[in-house]
Amino acid sequence: VDFSWDDDSVAFAEILDAIGELPIPPYLNRETEETDKTTYQTVYSKIKGSVAAPTAGLHFTQKVLADIDAHGIDREEVTLHVGAGTFKPVKSEEIEGHAMHTEYIAVRRQTFEKLLAHECHATAVGTTSVRTLESLYYMGVKLAMNPDAQEEDLHVNQWEPYDLPHNEEGLVIVGDKAVTAAEAIGHLRHWLDAAKLDVLHSSTQIIIAPGYTYQIVDKLITNFH
């Protein structure tokens, strides 16, 4: 689909805001309402780009976040721009026939520092966060294979995590050595330092299917199902 308009002073996002309709999950069984622009949104959302809110995060109020902070629990915010594929039902008989859309992510350097401080153990809020965090491991693996990789080279393909050689613990083997989560995150931090960047921008098509070995996420807070 190709979009064009004749007023360069108007951004595409402004056009979408003016004539578009906020997509809401089909299971709500109703039309979009004007109030959805504020209520169908997490309290910590900051960057426009997703076609849908990460619904697990809707249960976190400012008070809940304050209570988490009061208990000394480290928390970090990551960005994954949820794509239209989130509304795409699985129609194929086998999971191999389902194609994931590419989604763009942004992760701050301090998030890598926090992960390393906690030995790369994390509780993810929603599968959106899971896809982001687990993609980081495989991006770090790419840097273990090629330290000179460019930003576009870090993209994680849908079945890449399953096609790479793994040891019995599920760690990817590069050469004759298994890459731990801490090493993968360390590679990403070093790459950011070398590039003099504070934020990693990349993309992923990762799919979490039966048989997947989690590298960073060991707990998941998900939405009501």
Residue ranges and their predicted role:
Residues 1-225:
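Surface-exposed, charge/polar-rich loops and edge strands
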